[in-house]
Structures are given as structure tokens and as C-alpha cells.
Amino acid sequence: MENNELLDITLRPKSLKEFIGQKKIKDNIEVFIKAALIRQEPLDHVLFCGPPGLGKTTLATVIANELGVNIKSTSGPVLERAGDVAAILTNLSDRDILFIDEIHRLPRMVEEILYPAMEDFTLDIIVGQGPSARSIKINLPRFTLIGATTRTGLITSPLRDRFGVVFRLEFYNSEELKEIVKRSARILGILIEENAATEIARRSRGTPRVANRLLKRIRDFAQVKDKDIIDLQIAQEALIAMDVDDYGLDDMDRKILLTIIEKFNGGPAGIESIAASLREDKDTIEDVYEPYLMQEGFIERTARGRVATRFAYEVLKRKIPERLF
């Protein structure tokens, strides 16, 4: 496992008490967990939706810790055949958790295997071929499926309807991110000034994963410059060096906005056209960059495509077209 991955795991909260932000979701999860423990039943199936880096995987692990059960983690693209799911499900114990990241990318055949597993805790397996083929029903342990997706609209209705609990994670505010930065700094053994933590939080795109990534890189700058503490000056210098501006926009964010403004006259522009112009994957733009740009009012999605807002023109110091006056 890479050092960065080990660091990321170290920084992840292990309990609901340690988890910062998403208060309403946390409060509901706490109730559902307590009820499941009182009844000695598995937690109902849970679906987490929202942009990358907001804590979907972390919350799945936290739930397992709070319930005192094992968690088996996998992802939609990895589960190519029905047998892949069957092998995992039959090796779970009662009340264990199966976590499927990118659940919207499950092949249809695999998804259909999950229907009876989620509803009745059974698997219907076809044995043999041709006229001699027969169906065998296998009883499964009473497990909890936790799914995570950045693309709720791509999940089929039959699968979505089988989740008893659906949560949409929202971007974090600056105060929550500042607390996350300070907590991560303590774990990493870094001294950081209050205003430096505020600055990092302000430029973290509302996303804990980004906040932690920026903190680790700013630590590099501080150590190379022989600084014992991250102060506001070193934080700002490092953020400028990494092309992260006052609004949290990075180089790719600006390229997306400038493409809409300069190549498509401010839009509307189709996502495929934008992706082709940037030579970037369409899904990456939609999943990673677009949610924040929309949240902060840089672009709007219309039936005809993406449109750059007046705010985008102002921030990028481009001449504002008459239609936006």
C-alpha cells in the first residue's frame, strides 16, 4: 500500500464522534444503529450519494465500527460476474457489511443477483446448462449492503428502491473543514496556526479529501523551508505554488471555465464537447469538477448544456457579454 494511502486511512475517523460535519446524516445514522443493536438485527441497506471526497467510504467503515461487525469492501467495476458477488456474499457472517463503491457501475446481471439477496437474503443460482439446468436457492447470512455513488441518476430504480436508507452528502462549510484540518494536523504531528487552518479550509472546495491533500502538501513546503509550524504565509505561498486560487479553483477548474467562455462563447456547451476540447474524460468532469463549480455558482446546467455565469467571468477577469448584464 502506498504511503499516501496509509496516511489517508490514518486520517479517517473511526467513530461517529470523531466524524466532523454532515450532522443530520450522523444523527440519523446513530438512531438507526442503536435501533438495529436493540433488535439484534442487521442495519437496513444504506445508499450514500454525493461528489467524491465527502466521506461516503469513511461513513461505511464508521458504521461497521459502531455496529462491531466486519466490513468487506469492493467496487462496481470489479464485480464483473454473478459468481463474484455470490463468492463474497456466501463468505459474510450475520450482520456483516458489504460495501460497494461506484455501485452505479455494476453490470446488470450482477445487479439482478443482488435483488433477492437484499430483499430475502437468498441467492438464486443456475446450475448446469441447457435442458438439464436447474435453479438452486442458497440462504445467505443477514447482511447489510452499503452502496456509494457519485451518479445517483445512473442507479436503476429496482436497485435504488431496495435501499431502506438513502443519504445525500453535501459539501462542507469552512468551519467544518477548519476543524478537519486541525484534527488531521494533530494526527500527523504538525503544528498549524489558526489562520493557516482557516486559509486551507477556505480553499478546499468544501471537500475533506481536498483539505487533507492540501495540508499534506503544505507540510512538505514547510519542512523544506525548515519551518516548525505552518503559518498563514507558508500556507498561502504553498497554495499559490500549487495553483489553488482564493476560490479553491485549480488549473483544471479554470481550464473548464475558460473552455466554456472562450471556445463556446460562454455556452451553452455540451459536456461531450467540453471533454473533447480538454481531452479529459467526461465522467471525470461531471463527477470531480462540475459539482463544485455548480455549487459555487461558476456554471449552470441547462437543457442545452453548460453555461458560464457572470461570476465566472468576473473571477477569471474576462469581458462580460451583454446577455449577462
UniProtKB/Swiss-Prot annotation:
Mg(2+) binds at residue 57. Residues 173-243 are annotated as: Small ATPAse domain (RuvB-S). Homohexamer. Forms an RuvA(8)-RuvB(12)-Holliday junction (HJ) complex. HJ DNA is sandwiched between 2 RuvA tetramers; dsDNA enters through RuvA and exits via RuvB. An RuvB hexamer assembles on each DNA strand where it exits the tetramer. Each RuvB hexamer is contacted by two RuvA subunits (via domain III) on 2 adjacent RuvB subunits; this complex drives branch migration. In the full resolvosome a probable DNA-RuvA(4)-RuvB(12)-RuvC(2) complex forms which resolves the HJ. This is Holliday junction branch migration complex subunit RuvB. Keywords: ATP-binding, Cytoplasm, DNA damage, DNA recombination, DNA repair, DNA-binding, Hydrolase, Nucleotide-binding. One of its GO terms (cellular component) is cytoplasm. Pfam families: AAA_lid_4 (PF17864), RuvB_C (PF05491), RuvB_N (PF05496). It comes from Thermodesulfovibrio yellowstonii (strain ATCC 51303 / DSM 11347 / YP87). Its EC number is 3.6.4.-. One of its GO terms (molecular function) is four-way junction helicase activity. GO terms for biological process: DNA recombination; DNA repair. The RuvA-RuvB-RuvC complex processes Holliday junction (HJ) DNA during genetic recombination and DNA repair, while the RuvA-RuvB complex plays an important role in the rescue of blocked DNA replication forks via replication fork reversal (RFR). RuvA specifically binds to HJ cruciform DNA, conferring on it an open structure. The RuvB hexamer acts as an ATP-dependent pump, pulling dsDNA into and through the RuvAB complex. RuvB forms 2 homohexamers on either side of HJ DNA bound by 1 or 2 RuvA tetramers; 4 subunits per hexamer contact DNA at a time. Has 3 domains, the large (RuvB-L) and small ATPase (RuvB-S) domains and the C-terminal head (RuvB-H) domain. The head domain binds DNA, while the ATPase domains jointly bind ATP, ADP or are empty depending on the state of the subunit in the translocation cycle. During a single DNA translocation step the structure of each domain remains the same, but their relative positions change. Its main location: cytoplasm. InterPro entries: AAA+_ATPase, AAA_lid_4, DNA_helicase_Holl-junc_RuvB, P-loop_NTPase, RuvB-like_N, RuvB_C, WH-like_DNA-bd_sf, WH_DNA-bd_sf. NCBIfam families: PRK00080.1, ruvB. It is an enzyme of class 3 (hydrolase). Belongs to the RuvB family. ATP binds at residues 11-12, 53, 56-58, 119-121, 162, 172, 209.
